[in-house]
Swiss-Prot record:
Its EC number is 3.6.1.-. Keywords: Hydrolase. The lineage of its organism: Bacteria, Pseudomonadati, Pseudomonadota, Betaproteobacteria, Nitrosomonadales. Transmembrane segments: none annotated. Belongs to the Nudix hydrolase family. RppH subfamily. Coiled coil: none annotated. A motif (Nudix box) lies at residues 38-59. PROSITE patterns: NUDIX, NUDIX_BOX. One of its GO terms (molecular function) is pyrophosphatase activity. Accelerates the degradation of transcripts by removing pyrophosphate from the 5'-end of triphosphorylated RNA, leading to a more labile monophosphorylated state that can stimulate subsequent ribonuclease cleavage. Residues 6-149 form the Nudix hydrolase domain. It comes from Nitrosomonas eutropha (strain DSM 101675 / C91 / Nm57). This is RNA pyrophosphohydrolase.
Amino acid sequence: MIDRNGYRANVGIILLNSKSQVFWGKRARQNSWQFPQGGIKSGETPTQAMYRELAEETGLQPVHVEILGRTREWLRYDVPACWTRRDWRKNYRGQKQIWFLLRMLGRDCDVSLKTCAHPEFDAWRWNQYWVELESVVEFKRQVYRLALTELSRLLDHETCLGNDQAYREPLEPVKELEEKSSDARQG
């Protein structure tokens, strides 16, 4: 669904574990990291789209998470023309997103990146709430900052303590999904 201003309705998901660390997925066959996100289909509410995207990209079901909150307004970013599907270029400017903050109630083993034919991610990791965003594709970074900042109001003080040092801790090197799986079996 693209609105009259050229923005596709979308949801973004910031998923926390019990240590208030954030889920990051590595884009399949790319060297960039991002949060789960995806388009809102016709007839879907943002909440319904969030649960569908969560299941498609992480394998998690509603029973595995609780909603802590969402952004008050749509957050927007423009997508460079070179990243846009050719048939969309006339009317498409970018994405407008409602961001959800979720707490994971399930376990790490509930996460599965292979729930659909073309997975979005080929690796995942937990990281601190406030990290550098260099590993995020450049045109999404400002929206990530806005979403993290707005939703941080829902977190306890200790989790947000690093706000003045936000985005200074880099994402650690990739740990591939297969390595995680074999480590879990050996341990």
